[in-house]
A protein has these predicted regions:
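Ordered alpha/beta subdomains of enzyme catalytic regions
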Residues: 2-239, 253, 340-459
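Glycine-rich phosphate/ribose-binding loops and adjacent secondary-structure elements
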Residues: 220-376
Length: 459
């Protein structure tokens, strides 16, 4: 008998893909409302999700993960198994049985949601997602929303830096084997694709998301045969013009020479080790001297935006970059400071105050201003009821009402197209690889006054 358990998150248990304190708080809210005859209509909370600060050397961020967040809000339910699990927790022994018998079995998220468009660029302290609804509903979604949005926004922002450096190269995401879980590998492929990558090695991302899966061969495929050329022959026999030969198993230049047997009838050759700049120049000469001018050179091997910039600056003839570990883990700074904070309860603005952290209170809106050339100029954070500044773009738009989708989610290709068009509006200074410290979020006078008055009230 197989008693193993995968531990995978699925449609039947994803409601519990959260921190336990979300559920203890939620149950306490329920008990309080029950004892005080408070209905959910009179227990309305508003939260905003935003990033506190840039990861290292970032000057902008890319919003990604919205579709997975919305899927959760539409589909997550408490099942008999999850309810039984919670009921048996000793910590809940003082919670009224109706919580488990009536409330959870019939639970469905009843939330209003506003959001930036997925693929948009944004900056710290700007709400990218706003959630409003009964306190229990709005509270317990925090962990899941942060998980999918933090990670995908982190990877999309990293991929965007790489795309900025190599806008005319083919970019492939190769990081699944080094990502932090199978699901993280899929999400990394998705986030990279949003930020302009052309494909991924991840096959599930192809099956489920339509991101073209691509790959070459491993060194083991070459090593299986006594003669390197035999491995090329077999691969070519099966895959023909789609063949990409890995030529660095033994000797890169000799491998390149052997690949010339097939002329321009193969797609490319890949180099995965050594001095990529030197190897690429020598391989290109070998290919060209043997009439293989159309054969492309693919490079991998712990690539990142800095290494790719050096390769391009030194005119190495590499056509395709496969970027793995550095991208799928955002290795230079693998975290993003995303938070989800209560900013209003039953119409009353709320604020979080500490020595280092202040959360702007009240329901807010982000307005984007462009210059006369259509380039990004500044963002203004204001209270949502304030009139929009003239000639501004309002970034937070309604997407869910009363728990139902009211704005159709775009297809992944359309998200990528929006990103590619929109990122052109961001001045080049923001796209530098080093931190430039030029962004300053403009705060409206009414929001600043509200913030100051609440700080005075609570300190």
């Amino acid at each position: 008998m197989n008693d193993m358990n995968s531990g995978f998150v699925n449609d039947l248990n994803m409601i519990l893909a959260t921190d336990f304190y979300q559920l203890t708080m939620g149950a306490a809210y329920y008990q309080y409302n029950l004892e005080n005859n408070i209905t959910e209509e009179n227990d309305i909370a508003t939260f905003e999700l935003f990033i506190r600060k840039f990861p290292e050397n970032r000057n902008y961020l890319i919003f990604a993960g919205l579709e997975q967040a919305i899927q959760y809000l539409l589909n997550a339910r408490f099942t008999e198994r999850t309810i039984k699990f919670l009921r048996e927790k000793e910590v809940f022994k003082k919670i009224d049985p109706s919580f488990f018998d009536e409330y959870l079995p019939n639970f469905k998220f009843n939330l209003d949601v506003w959001t930036m468009r997925e693929g948009n660029f944004f900056f710290p302290n700007e709400p990218i997602l706003r959630v409003q609804g009964p306190m229990f509903h709005a509270q317990i979604v925090e962990t899941y929303l942060l998980n999918v949005i933090n990670f995908q926004s982190l990877i999309a922002s990293k991929a965007s830096r790489i795309k900025n450096i190599a806008p005319n190269k083919v970019l492939l995401e190769f990081g699944t084997r080094r990502s932090h879980s199978p699901l993280a590998g899929v999400y990394a492929a998705r986030a990279s694709y949003i930020a302009g990558f052309n494909g991924s090695s991840n096959v599930v991302a192809d099956l489920e998301l339509g991101i073209n899966s691509s790959g070459t061969m491993a060194h083991s495929f070459v090593q299986k045969f006594d003669d390197e050329l035999d491995s090329f022959d077999l691969y070519y026999k099966i895959y023909g013009k789609n063949s990409i030969f890995l030529i660095d198993t033994y000797d890169t230049e000799k491998g390149a020479q052997k690949s010339c047997k097939y002329g321009n009838t193969i797609w490319g050759v890949r180099i995965d080790s050594g001095d990529l700049i030197d190897h690429a120049k020598k391989v290109r000469k070998i290919l060209d001297d043997n009439g293989c001018e159309k054969v492309l050179i693919v490079a991998s091997s712990d690539l990142n935006e800095y290494k790719i910039k050096e390769i391009i600056d030194k005119n190495a003839p590499i056509d395709v970059f496969g970027v793995g570990t550095e991208l799928a883990t955002s290795r230079d700074d693998p975290t993003i400071a995303g938070v989800y904070k209560l900013i209003e309860y039953n119409g009353e603005p709320k604020i979080k105050i500490s020595e280092e952290k202040v959360t702007y209170p009240g329901i807010k809106q982000v307005h984007r201003i462009y210059d006369r050339n259509g380039m990004f100029k500044e963002d203004i954070l204001s209270l949502a009821y304030e009139p929009a500044p003239s000639n501004s773009e309002t970034l937070l738009i309604p997407i869910m009402k009363d728990g139902e989708l009211i704005t159709k989610l775009p297809k992944l290709d359309d998200i990528q197209k929006f990103y590619l068009d929109n990122i052109k509006k961001l001045p080049k200074t923001y796209k530098k690889l080093e931190e430039v410290d030029i962004f300053e979020l403009k705060i409206s006078e009414k929001l600043r006054h509200l913030t100051d008055s609440l700080k005075l009230k609570y300190t």
